[in-house]
């Protein structure tokens, strides 16, 4: 077998492979002999059909099958011989395909980039630390109460946090516009659900009152036909209802499936959940900084095939998440290219760190992670048992643990600054940078 390789770009390879005619004929004859043993042809006993008859009837099909298998087999033999690591399937172009002659074909494909992860000492990480103090716990209890608020009709003027039942008709340039009208809609004042000025304009309104609100759609409003335009809404208030927060009692505690009784038992369980959330938030922020640092210090070119595969995965995830009748390939690839590129780059860089430092998932950390996740459930022992019986889930946990070990490895070499902050600051999501 003859092999030559041409580097057509940083990652693309054009490999020409020649397969001797003798090898082709051997494979063709092998298939014809297999066919002869089971062929049923009128006038001949099974297994006794002359090879000349078998060849006349079946040689073309056997040759096509043999050539297809040989191209696949010799391609992988060639990449092993040339020490290449293909990233995706090759595009195959036959050059010589004549019977009785050597087979020659060209395989064009991309390879994984070869690089060494460096620049660990250029990575700067701010590692937060925080505690759950009593005031944080009190605030969380109020949040839980507000999440379970109920509303009672009140005979008074509307205030912020009241729930109004309203009918409204919206007009732009004196014309009713699509989606601008509704009846019997529930609206909590101050929720920010409506465009600026709408909810504020209903503060002080009473049941049965009609108000005309003059507002302006934001410049970045999702409906471009309405963005930046002035609108007039005629609103009729049907009812005004005031919020009633639930009492912190046994009935309230049961809604959260907490076995501990009494306010102190409830506070203890809520604190545990907050501490678990805090640990995850701090860990996530450190990981994001490490990954950002690795990307900045190690710019690499990634194979187009991997990017396309990742874009397609993100398309499928988007359809599964948001539903609807749309098909994944109907979503524009541009929506996912930036995220796909980051994920592919990080996947390659993280894999290389694992290889460079010979990292393997730590069994103790795997157990600890499973127990941490299980502690959020009412029957943690059952959750732990479920994980250990499910190999796919175990592999996912091992993968997460291995990423954490990569982060720890980088932190040992990076510039790390510790900073003490409040619980609220520690768990606050990091805002994505705005596009220019």
Swiss-Prot record:
It catalyses: [protein]-peptidylproline (omega=180) = [protein]-peptidylproline (omega=0). Its EC number is 5.2.1.8. Coiled coil: none annotated. Keywords: Cell cycle, Cell division, Chaperone, Cytoplasm, Isomerase, Rotamase. Its main location: cytoplasm. Residues 161-246 form the PPIase FKBP-type domain. InterPro entries: PPIase_dom_sf (IPR046357), PPIase_FKBP_dom (IPR001179), Trig_fac (IPR005215), Trigger_fac_C (IPR008880), Trigger_fac_C_sf (IPR037041), Trigger_fac_ribosome-bd_bac (IPR008881), Trigger_fac_ribosome-bd_sf (IPR036611), Trigger_fact/SurA_dom_sf (IPR027304). Signal peptide: none annotated. One of its GO terms (biological process) is 'de novo' cotranslational protein folding. One of its GO terms (cellular component) is cytoplasm. GO terms for molecular function: peptidyl-prolyl cis-trans isomerase activity; protein folding chaperone; ribosome binding. The keyword Cell division applies. It is an enzyme of class 5 (isomerase). It is found in: Cytoplasm. Pfam families: FKBP_C, Trigger_C, Trigger_N. PROSITE patterns: FKBP_PPIASE. Consists of 3 domains; the N-terminus binds the ribosome, the middle domain has PPIase activity, while the C-terminus has intrinsic chaperone activity on its own. HAMAP family: Trigger_factor_Tig (MF_00303). Involved in protein export. Acts as a chaperone by maintaining the newly synthesized protein in an open conformation. Functions as a peptidyl-prolyl cis-trans isomerase. Belongs to the FKBP-type PPIase family. Tig subfamily. This is Trigger factor. It comes from Pseudomonas savastanoi pv. phaseolicola (strain 1448A / Race 6). The lineage of its organism: Bacteria, Pseudomonadati, Pseudomonadota, Gammaproteobacteria, Pseudomonadales.
